[in-house]
Every structure is written in C-alpha cells, then in structure tokens.
Amino acid sequence: MNSSTALMCFALLLISPLCMGYSDEDREADSRRIGEIIQNAQDDDSKINSTQELLDIYRRLYPSLSLEDRENIDKFVNEHTDAIVIDGVPIQGGRKAKIIGKIVSPAAKGLAVGFFEELGSKIAQLFTG
C-alpha cells in the first residue's frame, strides 16, 4: 500500500504542471503580444480599441502575479475606469473598462489614451521584471 501511495504522489507531481492554466509559453506569447499592441497603437483610436485586449491579457496573467502587483494594477484600473464618462454620462452595461464608444468627447478620449498608455506600461513591466 505504501508504494502505491508514493507512486500516486509521483504521478501527481508529473501531471500537475500540465494542469496549470497559464504556462510559460502562454506568458511568452502574451509578452510578445503586449509589445505588438503598444508598438502598433500609434493613433488615439487604435489605443482606445486596444485597451480591452490589454485588460484581457492582464486577466489571464492575474493568478500568477504577486499580491502587490495585483493590488497595484487593480487600484489603477478601478480608479480610472470609475472616472470614465462619455458625454458626461457614466458608461453602462458590461464591464466598466469597456470604454469604447462611437462618439467620444475630447476629454474622455484623452483620458482613455492615457489609461491605455499607463496600463500598457504597467503590464509590460510585469513581463520585464
């Protein structure tokens, strides 16, 4: 009975890395994608349109981050998404971070672009150390 327990534990140790939700390959692919997003987002509209993809990458990365990193980025996201309004009205429906609208006032556009740039910088720093 003792050897079968040891064999089961050994098998679990071999299988457990395969069950992890965010592999090193996924992390590397997301790291490259962050670089592509930041490099390709040259104008304000492309930055605003890419914000949701940055947030999606952050959500995938979230479980593997330290508590300090998670709190830092969560605080930033919550502070800025609460402040985003379109034509003086808070956005409605779905997640607060979906800030894309067909008509965005210049002030909201500037805020959204700044949010994209800061979020991209914070997430990129997670990959570079």
UniProtKB/Swiss-Prot annotation:
One of its GO terms (cellular component) is extracellular space. The lineage of its organism: Eukaryota, Metazoa, Ecdysozoa, Arthropoda, Hexapoda. Its main location: secreted. Belongs to the Turandot family. This is Protein Turandot A1. Residues 1-21 form the signal peptide. It is found in: Secreted. A humoral factor that plays a role in stress tolerance; gives increased resistance to the lethal effects of bacterial challenge and stress. Regulated by the JAK/STAT pathway and NF-KB-like Relish pathway in the fat body, upd3 in the hemocytes and Mekk1 in response to septic injury and consequent immune response. It holds the Pfam family Turandot. Keywords: Antibiotic, Antimicrobial, Glycoprotein, Immunity, Innate immunity, Secreted, Signal. Glycans are attached at N49. One of its GO terms (biological process) is response to cold.
